[in-house]
Curated annotation (Swiss-Prot):
Region (Disordered): 1-238, 271-500, 888-1084, 1116-1201
Organism: Homo sapiens
Record remark: domains: Tne C-terminal domain is important for its transactivation activity.
Signal peptide stretch: none
GO MF: beta-catenin binding; transcription coactivator activity
Compositional bias segments (type: Pro residues): 20-37, 281-291, 301-325, 445-458, 1122-1132, 1168-1179
Compositionally biased spans, kind Low complexity: 351-363, 370-387
Compositionally biased spans, kind Gly residues: 222-232
Swiss-Prot/TrEMBL keywords: Acetylation, Activator, Isopeptide bond, Methylation, Nucleus, Phosphoprotein, Transcription, Transcription regulation, Ubl conjugation
N6-acetyllysine PTM positions: 36, 108, 110, 137
UniProt-recorded name of the protein: B-cell CLL/lymphoma 9-like protein
Cross-link (Glycyl lysine isopeptide (Lys-Gly) (interchain with G-Cter in SUMO2)): 1344
PANTHER family associated with the record: B-CELL CLL_LYMPHOMA 9-LIKE PROTEIN, BCL9
């Protein structure tokens, strides 16, 4: 935060001052107060001259020296000088530095851009800062981008990614320092360069060189910045004026407020030297000395620093780092305080944010083995000092206790604010900074930073706690920074990361990443996941890899393999055992948190390791951080530990801590920090244990339980915090994933509680988490988030992922993996959301994860996502098979519901997460589903990537997870509305709805629980219960959601409302389509691919295609999208899925409600009822159906419900009704609407039951809203659509063949693929379908859609209006059906048999078909049921693909999916589980389907 604060404050001032010319501006800036800037900026500036007392000074001195030497210019230059270094080699000292900088020089340009030239992070910041500063804010995105760009630079890019992140971190720190420009700038440069470039070392050296002493020192200093500080550092220490963050911030504020001309001037005027001297004295003395010595190893000791510095400077950073690492720990603790250390810490640390990041980056590169070390110092500084620490560093260093406290408070405030604002506020900063960097280069950087922070934090926090030096500072810092950061350390880095990740991911996904990049990232993620898995080795490594991969993967995408590699090695290695936990822990919180539990390993080595591992992970995967942090969020993202944000990862871990700490947890727990601490330990221990246990146990069940418990705990601890983050940010991704999981678990545990209250928060978080896992998550977003996420970015994801992965690989493998993956997706996935889920998702989010989706798709797809998606249903079913899974589901739904409900973003996370969690767990049961989950993945990344993504994710998650999320997704959708999403979810759902949802959710959970039980038992019971719950909840939901949402949301649906409603329902679908389209399409494609490939490979191309499609789709979708765009995306994703999700959620509810949903729709009930009747029949079918319902409607709970109720109404529903229900329900509102719309629109439902239903259906159902337009028509339209669709779909469609089938059958295109069979269940020629070209080319598919649209046109009109897309959707659907998706759809429909009924019902058939198909289906279904199951499974798979299409219809899709190629896949899938998953998937797919389906459908 401090950094943030600085960043925010200082950067602004700086920005203001420096915004102008990066190089000059800073200079100018500095120049204004050349010495001053130097001085003020360099705390050490004054002493800087001297020795630049303290490495800081040194660094700063570097700047300072140069600055000082350079003089004003030096300062300016120094500050900027470093920048200058970067920017202008001309600075005399800088020149030297430049020498150091040369790379910098080269970096220089980049530096500027790269900020990463952490070299001058500060400088960069200064120089680059202008942009940087702007970027500071943008930093995450930009930084990330930069990172992305910078990625080119091995270290710079990466580091700089990190660096920038760092820079953000750094920047703030740098800013602070930069504010104290010279200080950090130089320090950063030193460190930054050194670390980053290692130039800093050189630079330090160089700058030092100019300094003479500094040079001498500098060499040392370079080594540690401290070196400079070391030699001169100590003395300079006397003079080193360390700026406290407070001071820097104050100065920045003053500048901003216009009280001061420049920060430097302000400092000159206002900074009491006594204080400075005093502070440095105090901390420096203790710190410098200790640090010095330890640090000495690092930078502090000049002698050691020298060596280390050189190492750092070289690539030895690791060496230096390692040496430093240990010392760093001390050093870190000390460093920040020590001037030298501070220098190191500050310089390095301060720099670190830049530098450490850089170093970290570097280190990470070196993998830093001690990123912590070299970066450690930096990290340390950063983490310790920078984290808070640079500020701390600087601040700490120069800070008096009072100042520290003040700063701490300020930081805390900032953090809180950020947390609130950002996915993971805390996380975000780091996330922003390191995560961003980490995210970009960030992973490494971030990892390092987190490592730094974690190390620092751990060291700082821990160590600091341990050490007096840092005790105070650390505490201050720790609390303020490290602790926060401690928690945040990991979190910030992680959280940040998560968030950043989520955000980044989102951003990346969106901003930085192109879908391709995202896809790449996904691939990377996958790659890393594999790699890591191998690399990591199974448990630990499994986890870690996953986590890393996932976390990292998400992020990894960013910090791709190389850095990751490096890091991972480090990471894994150090982290290996510890890291096991690390990853897990990382996941866990941070692993910092875990760290504490495993302080020894973690901290010392592990810490670093964690840092590396974690950090590495972080480094490696930003995601790890994300995961770890976001997810380590972020997250995942991840997650969560984003998401996760994850936004992820961050979310997860971070979320946990941060969020927990800051947010939910805080609310939940006494103090975030306290809670965090407790949690951390507890959690860590527990989690470690739990995680490990699960890991070790590997027992799915156990793992599941454990994980769940662990998650619950962790999540609870983390989750809430996460949650908020998630909610707030994509981080939710990560966080929520946790939340989700937590939610799931917790939901399980206390559905009502969690569900309602906590859950709402938590749940939201949970959902967010889920989604986050993505923000994921998630997501953010991640991001938040993301994410984290978003991380999620993620935590859950991460957690899931980590542990899951860990577990998964170990025991939980499938599920956990799936879950993790899903989470990962989510988290990462964050996410930010950070994604924020919006993210974060979005991530995360948590973070439109197109890319995320990609990875997720790949990842999740293969694993978690599907599972997640299906998990609830599927997983549960498969896993627990109903029982366990169901249970899982049960919780899931609750979690889902409430959480989903609660959070849109969280939804994403939560819904998703819960899905993930629950599902995941369940998923585990059906890992295959996991694949399907891909969508989830998509979803995950979706959230991660973006809101939409996040939402997508959400939807997906929700969809998959839970309709709940769906609702949430709508929220998220809206939210991507991240917050909105949460809100939205609730909100759209209508608060009431959502609330109800919560209610529902609660009920859902209740029913879930009940249903779970009941469901299984009494489908009806479930039906009842769900209906009941659902009704009340769902119905409410529906109503509210549908109605309300429909009205409101629905309206929104049309437009924004659509978002909610639509978002909820249709929007979700439709515009989910939109967003989802990307993801959806991606997912769709993905799914298709999945379907086709089930392997991610296609995914990539597919992904690309999907992207293209999406592009096209989006365009196509746009209408819808516009309507629901925002929401749609998220919602689409979320809603689509969301719809599915919400509907699922609701649907869930609805599905659960199925009857309810149906009820809601009324028609649906029809459908449902028939389905129910059918259901019963189909109970077997029900299974499928449930699946379907689940898949389709329930997606999550409904799925559950349905699924649960497989027999239950849901069953019915599920199969067909459910499908419709699902669709309807899914859209619940939409789908629910669909239900009725779906029912009616069954056609629509059929057509796009999910989709159009959503839309139309949703619209229709929610006719209220949409229905307005299409409401009447909608339903009719839906019917029409359904009919049209159906008609179109199959004129034959009617009963004979499921409409879908008929349609499909009729569909010429489909006809090739699908053949009617006596059973009435169409057979699909997967070979034809699978190509997933169509899905891939949703476009194509659309075109088909278009073809059919005419038919559907009428409906289309409404639909069209509804979304044309709807019509198109419908047509699309049918066309889709026909067209691949068409098939899917048609298939879906037809395939639905089990679900098809649903599908059909959904198709529009639902009602009809629901009725007929229902009946028909029943018969058909029944047989098909098995078939369906398989088919469903296939479908599912297909649905994965088709499902995408089917998203909304995921459920339908399910059928559709069935229809689609996936039938086989469906088989593939667990069949019904798959199918469920399909549904889920679909839901998840929702994004796919929703987006895809919906998008497709709609679009």
């Amino acid at each position: 935060m401090r950094i943030l604060a600085n960043k925010t404050r200082l950067p602004h001032p700086r920005r203001r001052e420096a915004p102008g010319s990066p190089p000059l501006s800073p200079r100018g800036h500095c120049p204004p107060a050349p010495a001053k800037p130097m001085h003020p900026e360099n705390k050490l500036t004054n002493h800087g001259k001297t020795g630049n007392g303290g490495a800081q000074s040194q660094h700063q001195n570097v700047n300072q020296g140069p600055t000082c030497n350079v003089g004003s210019k030096g300062v300016g230059a120094g500050n900027h000088g470093a920048k200058a270094n970067q920017i202008s080699p001309s600075n005399s000292s800088l020149k030297n530095p430049q020498a150091g900088v040369p790379p910098f020089s080269s970096l220089k340009g980049k530096v500027k851009r790269d900020r990463s030239v952490s070299v001058d992070s500060g400088e960069q910041r200064e120089a680059g800062t202008p942009s940087l500063d702007s970027e500071a804010k943008e930093v995450a995105p930009r930084s990330k981008r930069r990172c992305v760009l910078e990625r080119k630079q091995p270290y710079s890019g990466d580091e700089w990614c990190s660096g920038p992140d760092s820079e953000e971190d750094d920047k703030p720190i740098g800013a602070t320092h930069n504010c104290n420009v010279a200080d950090p700038a130089m320090a950063a440069p030193q460190l930054g360069p050194g670390q980053t470039t290692q130039l800093p070392l050189s630079e330090s050296s160089v700058p030092g060189a100019p300094h003479g002493p500094p040079p001498g020192l500098r060499p040392d200093a370079p080594g540690g910045g401290g070196g400079g500080g070391g030699v001169p550092g100590k003395p300079p220490s006397q003079f080193v004026y360390v700026f406290t963050t407070h001071l820097a911030n104050t100065a920045a504020e003053a500048v901003l407020q216009g009280r001061a001309d420049s920060i430097l001037a302000y400092h000159q005027q206002n900074v009491p030297r006594a204080k400075l001297d005093q502070a440095p004295k105090v901390p420096p003395t203790p710190e410098p000395l200790p640090l010095s010595t330890p640090s000495a190893g690092t930078p502090q000791s000049q002698p050691p620093p020298l060596p280390p510095p050189p190492p750092p400077a070289p690539g030895s950073a690791p060496p230096a780092l390692p040496p430093e690492g240990p010392p760093e720990d001390s050093s870190q603790d000390l460093a920040p305080n020590s001037v030298g250390a501070a220098s190191t810490g500050g310089g390095t640390g301060g720099t670190h944010p830049n530098t450490p990041t850089a170093t970290t980056a570097n280190n990470p590169l070196p993998p830093g083995g001690d990123p912590s070390s070299a970066p450690g110092p930096a990290l340390l500084g950063e983490a310790a000092a920078p984290g808070n620490g640079q500020r701390s560093l600087v601040g700490s260093e120069g800070l008096s206790k009072e100042q520290l406290e003040h700063r701490e408070r300020s930081l805390q405030t900032l953090r809180d604010i950020e947390r609130l604002l950002l996915r993971s506020g805390e996380t975000e900063p780091f996330l922003k900074g390191p995560p961003g960097g980490a995210g970009e280069g960030g992973p490494p950087a971030q990892a390092p930073p987190p490592p730094q922070q974690p190390p620092t934090a751990p060291p700082s926090g821990l160590k600091k706690y341990e050490e007096p030096l840092q005790s105070m500072i650390s505490q201050t810092q720790s609390l303020g920074g490290p602790p926060l950061e401690h928690e945040v350390p990991g979190h910030p880095p992680g959280g940040d990361m998560g968030q950043q990740m989520n955000m980044m991911i989102q951003r990346l996904g969106q901003d930085s990443l192109t879908p391709e990049q995202v896809a790449w990232r996904k691939l990377q993620e996958e790659y890393y996941e594999e790699k890591r898995r191998k690399e990591e080795q199974i448990g630990l490594h499994g986890s870690r890899p996953l986590q890393d991969m996932m976390g990292m993967g998400g992020m990894m995408v960013r910090g791709p393999p190389p850095p990751y590699h490096s890091k991972p090695g480090d990471q894994w290695p150090p982290g290996m055992g510890a890291q096991l936990r690390g990853p897990m822990d990382v996941q866990d919180p941070m692993q910092l948190r875990g760290g504490p539990p495993f302080p020894g390993p973690r901290f010392p080595g592990n810490q670093i390791q964690r840092v590396p591992g974690f950090g590495g992970m972080q480094s490696m995967p930003m995601e790890v951080p994300m995961n770890a942090m976001q997810r380590p969020v972020r997250p995942g993202m991840g997650w969560t530990e984003d998401l996760p944000p994850m936004g992820g990862p961050s979310n997860f871990a971070q979320n946990t801590m941060p969020y927990p700490g800051g947010q939910g947890e805080a609310e939940r727990f006494m103090t975030p920090r306290v809670r965090e601490e407790l949690l951390r330990h507890q959690l860590l221990e527990k989690r470690s244990m739990g995680m490990q246990r699960p890991l070790g146990m590997a027992g799915s069940g156990m793992g599941q339980s454990m994980e769940m418990e662990r998650m619950m705990q962790a999540h609870r601890q983390m989750d809430p915090a996460m949650f908020p983050g998630q909610m707030a940010g994509g981080e939710g991704l990560a966080g929520t994933p946790m939340g989700m999981e937590f939610g799931g678990g917790r939901g399980l545990l206390s559905p009502p509680m969690g569900q309602s209250g906590l859950r709402e928060v938590d749940p939201p978080m949970g959902p967010g988490n889920l989604n986050m896992n993505m923000n994921v998550n998630m997501n953010m977003n991640m991001n938040l988030n993301v994410q984290m996420t978003p991380q999620q970015q993620m935590l859950m994801s991460q957690k899931m992922r980590g542990p899951g992965d860990l577990m998964g690989p170990q025991g939980l493998s499938p599920e956990e993996m799936a879950r993790v993956r899903a989470q990962n997706s989510s988290g990462v996935m964050g996410g930010p959301q950070k994604m924020l889920m919006p993210s974060q998702f979005p991530n995360q989010g948590q973070q439109g994860f197109s890319g995320g989706q990609g990875p997720y798709q790949a990842m999740s797809q293969d694993m978690g996502n599907t599972q997640d998606m299906f998990s609830p249903d599927q997983s549960s079913m498969p896993m627990s098979n109903v029982g366990t899974t169901r249970l899982s589901h049960m919780p899931l739904p609750p979690a889902s519901n409430p959480p989903g409900t609660v959070h849109s973003a969280p939804n994403r996370g939560l819904g998703r997460r819960p899905s993930d969690l629950t599902i995941s767990i369940n998923q585990m049961g059906s890992p295959g589903m996991g694949h399907l989950k891909s969508p989830t993945l998509s979803q995950v990344h979706s959230p991660l990537v973006t809101s939409p993504s996040a939402n997508l994710k959400s939807p997906q998650t929700p969809s998959q997870m839970v309709p709940l999320p769906s609702a949430n997704p709508p929220g998220p959708l809206k939210s991507p509305q991240v917050l909105g999403s949460s809100l939205s979810v609730r909100s759209p759902t209508g608060s009431p709805s959502r609330l109800k949802s919560p209610s529902m959710a609660v009920p859902s959970p209740g029913w879930v629980a009940s249903p779970k039980t009941a469901m299984p038992s009494p489908g009806v019971s479930q039906n009842k219960q769900p209906p009941l719950n659902m009704n009340s909840s769902t119905t409410l939901s529906n109503m509210e959601q549908g109605t309300l949402p429909p009205s409101g949301p629905r309206s929104s649906s049309s437009a924004p409302p659509a978002n909610p409603p639509s978002g909820l329902m249709n929007p979700s679908l439709p515009f989910t389509s939109s967003p989802d389209p990307t993801p959806s399409q991606n997912p769709l494609s993905l799914m298709m691919t999945q379907m086709s490939k089930y392997a991610m490979p296609s995914s990539t191309p597919l992904y690309h295609n999907a992207i293209k499609t999406i592009a096209t789709s989006d365009d196509e979708l746009l209408p819808d999208r516009p309507l629901l765009p925002p929401p749609p995306p998220p919602q689409g994703s979320g809603p689509g899925i969301s719809n599915s999700q919400p509907s699922q959620m609701h649907l869930n509810s609805a599905a659960a409600q199925s009857p309810m949903g149906m009820n809601l729709p009324g028609q649906q009930p029809l459908s449902h009822e028939p389905p129910p009747a059918m259901l019963p029949s189909p109970t077997p079918l029900g299974s499928n159906i449930p699946l379907h319902p689940n898949a389709q409607g329930t997606g999550g709970p409904p799925q559950n419900s349905m699924m649960m109720a497989p027999g239950g109404p849901d069953s019915l529903n599920a199969p067909c009704g459910p499908v419709p229900s699902s669709s309807q329900m899914m859209p619940f509102p939409p789908r629910l609407q669909q239900p009725h719309g779906a029912m009616a629109p069954t056609g629509g439902g059929g057509g796009g039951p999910g989709l159009q239903q959503h839309y139309p259906s949703g619209m229709a159902l929610p006719p209220e809203d949409l229905p307005n337009q299409p409401p009447g028509p909608m339903p009719p339209q839906q019917h029409l659509m359904g009919k049209a669709m159906a008609g179109r779909m199959g004129d034959a469609y009617p009963p004979g063949v499921l409409p879908g089938v008929a349609s499909v059958l009729n569909d010429p295109e489909l006809s090739e693929v699908i053949r009617p069979t006596p059973t009435g269940i169409p057979e699909f020629d997967l070979s034809r379908i699978i190509p997933s070209e169509k899905p891939s080319s949703t476009l194509q598919y659309f075109p088909k859609s278009e073809n059919q649209p005419p038919k559907a046109q009428p409906p289309n009109l409404h639909l069209m209006n509804l979304q044309n897309m709807m019509a198109e959707q419908t047509p699309s659907r049918p066309p889709n059906l026909p067209g691949q998706q068409g098939v899917q759809r048609g298939l879906n429909m037809s395939m639905c048999h089990p679900g098809q009924m649903s599908l059909l019902g959904r198709t529009g058939v639902p009602p009809q078909q629901g009725m007929v198909p229902h009946g028909l289906h029943q018969g058909v279904m029944s047989p098909p049921q098995g078939l369906m199951t398989q088919q469903n499974f296939m479908l599912m798979k297909q649905r994965g693909v088709g499902g995408e299409v089917y998203s909304q219809p995921p459920h339908m899709l399910s059928p559709q999916g069935s229809l689609m190629g996936p039938p086989p896949q469906q088989n593939l899938m667990v069949s019904h589980p798959l199918r469920q998953r399909s549904v889920s998937l679909d839901s998840q797919m929702g994004y796919l389907p929703a987006p895809g389906g919906m998008a497709n459908l709609p679009f």
